[in-house]
Each structure stands twice: as C-alpha cells, then as structure tokens.
Curated annotation (Swiss-Prot):
Quaternary state and interactors: Part of the 30S ribosomal subunit. Forms a tight heterodimer with protein bS6.
Family from the record: Belongs to the bacterial ribosomal protein bS18 family.
A Gene Ontology term for the protein's cellular component: cytosolic small ribosomal subunit
NCBIfam families: S18
Pfam families noted in UniProt: Ribosomal_S18
Protein name: Small ribosomal subunit protein bS18A
Gene source species: Mycolicibacterium paratuberculosis (strain ATCC BAA-968 / K-10)
Single biological process term from Gene Ontology: translation
Entry-linked PANTHER family: 30S RIBOSOMAL PROTEIN S18, SMALL RIBOSOMAL SUBUNIT PROTEIN BS18A
Lineage: Bacteria, Bacillati, Actinomycetota, Actinomycetes, Mycobacteriales
Role description: Binds as a heterodimer with protein bS6 to the central domain of the 16S rRNA, where it helps stabilize the platform of the 30S subunit.
MF GO annotations: small ribosomal subunit rRNA binding; structural constituent of ribosome
HAMAP family, A to Z: Ribosomal_bS18
Keywords: Ribonucleoprotein, Ribosomal protein, RNA-binding, rRNA-binding
InterPro entries: Ribosomal_bS18, Ribosomal_bS18_CS, Ribosomal_bS18_sf
C-alpha cells in the first residue's frame, strides 16, 4: 500500500516589507567609530547579523560589515563575546 500524499499546504504568513534604515534616513552615515550604531547589528555572540534579519539593503549591509570589521581591528568592538 502506498502512502497517500494528501497533505494540507501550510498557511502562508504575511511577508512584512522592511525598508533599509540608511536608505530612509539619508543623513545617517555608517562609521566604524560609531559603536552604539554598530552594536545594534551584532548578535550577543559577536556575529554580524544577516541582511534578512536587519532589513538593510545590499550596499548598506556591506558597509555595516566593513565598519564592524574595522572597529574590531582598532579594538572598539570585541571579536567575540565573553559569554559561554
């Protein structure tokens, strides 16, 4: 006997369109010295959050990643967190 393939399709969740914060606010710049801004894009473990999580556009997500890496190099941000 073959199994029947009559599964119900999962209900579709409404997709919320997120706008890039930096595209919306043209005057806000991404700088490696602005650690308060950069900490919002870093997880508790010290990883850079993904674009689908932050809602940034491609260019600004790249700029955030470069700024975080530069801030880590000059010891403004830690490479990893101390929580284990």
């Amino acid at each position: 006997m073959a199994k029947s393939n009559k599964r119900r399709p999962a209900p579709e969740k409404p997709v919320k369109a997120r706008k890039c914060v930096f595209c919306a606010k043209k005057d806000q710049a991404i700088d490696y010295k602005d650690t308060a801004l950069l900490r919002t894009y870093i997880s508790e473990r010290g990883k850079i959050r993904a674009r689908r999580v932050t809602g940034n556009c491609v260019q600004h997500q790249r700029d955030i990643a470069i700024a975080v890496k530069n801030a880590r190099e000059v010891a403004l941000l830690p490479f990893t967190s101390s929580a284990r």
